[in-house]
């Protein structure tokens, strides 16, 4: 019984300033 790895959600693209 191994824990399921949950990857972090993808981050939104950084807006160009």
UniProtKB/Swiss-Prot annotation:
Signal peptide as annotated in the record: none
GO cellular component, one term: extracellular space
UniProt keyword Cell cycle present: no
Induction section of the entry: By bacterial infection.
Known function: Antimicrobial peptide active against many Gram-negative enterobacterial and plant-associated bacterial species. Not active against other bacterial species like H.pylori, P.mirabilis, B.pertussis or N.gonorrhoeae.
Family to which the UniProt record says this protein belongs: Belongs to the apidaecin family.
Keyword tags: Antibiotic, Antimicrobial, Immunity, Innate immunity, Secreted
Principal location: secreted
Annotated protein name in UniProt: Apidaecin P
Cell compartment(s), UniProt: Secreted
GO biological process, one term: defense response to Gram-negative bacterium
SS bond partners: none
